[in-house]
Amino acid sequence: MTHCCSPCCQPTCCRTTCCRTTCWKPTTVTTCSSTPCCQPSCCVSSCCQPCCRPACCQNTCCRTTCCQPTCLSSCCGQTSCGSSCGQSSSCAPVYCRRTCYYPTTVCLPGCLNQSCGSSCCQPCCRPACCETTCCRTTCFQPTCVSSCCQPSCC
């Protein structure tokens, strides 16, 4: 994992461009940068998703939108999936299925990390407030909205 390691749940020692951690049990690396790079959603610019558990990494991207990240065979964006999601590895914004500490949800086409349509729920790493039928959350700092969705979403 020379270009990309999982982001951090807790502060840990960092390389210049890469955090190395198993979130709940952070481990240090041999070389530390002078300015810590480990933040809840920080690493290299092309790999900035929070995680709750170790994330498998590709060349320049982590796919870590949930508590149990999935390895992908090719580089995908934050709202895309690849072969390990059971979809094309072309990184089109298609279905992602993730298992969280809370319910398993399915992100439908067109869903963004914090903005979804009426038929889309986002995975939750911690309890999150909901809007209509859409979970709106970031893993470590859930954003509460005025109304709550069905229990199956959050």
UniProtKB/Swiss-Prot annotation:
Keyword Repeat: yes
InterPro entries named in the record: KAP
UniProt Sequence repeat ranges: 8-12, 13-17, 18-22, 37-41, 42-46, 51-55, 56-60, 61-65, 66-70, 75-79, 124-128, 129-133, 134-137, 148-152
GO CC, alphabetical: cytosol; keratin filament
Record key words, sorted: Keratin, Repeat
Region ranges (14 X 5 AA repeats of C-C-[RQVGE]-[SPSTNQ]-[TASL]): 8-152
Self-association and partners: Interacts with hair keratins.
Function as written in the Swiss-Prot or TrEMBL entry: In the hair cortex, hair keratin intermediate filaments are embedded in an interfilamentous matrix, consisting of hair keratin-associated proteins (KRTAP), which are essential for the formation of a rigid and resistant hair shaft through their extensive disulfide bond cross-linking with abundant cysteine residues of hair keratins. The matrix proteins include the high-sulfur and high-glycine-tyrosine keratins.
Family, per entry: Belongs to the KRTAP type 9 family.
Name under which the protein is recorded: Keratin-associated protein 9-9
